[in-house]
Amino acid sequence: MPYMSKNYAIKTGKDNTAITGFSMGGRESLYIGFSRSDLFGYIGAMCPAPVLTTDLITESDLKFTENYSYLLMISAGSNDQIVWSTPSGYHDTLNKNSVEHVWHYVTDGDHGSNTIRPHIYNFVHSIFKA
């Protein structure tokens, strides 16, 4: 983020900063977003991959330590044969932890563009309101 501030005219602060990713990037966007909730006001995950080690992301990590407004969106496809039900597991954990979030389930969506496109569309439109 310092590179962006140095080289581009950008707005700073978590109200102007988002992170989202697909598959392994989706898992990492959740990890980074929750770990650095002071930097990101918008967190998205498209078909997020499972955690490969038990200590990388725990259930207790999937909650915010402070009370603030944010957007958290997780998208999943009903026909995803790569991450299977992993996104649903994140969704269930967020519910268990009473973390408000948008659960975007794409009927007939797979681990590809027919799930990615709707996520990007809805995520960006939720952030940048006209």
Q: Where are these predicted regions, by residue range?
A:
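Non-catalytic cap/lid and distal C-terminal segments of serine-dependent acyl enzymes
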Residues: M1-A130
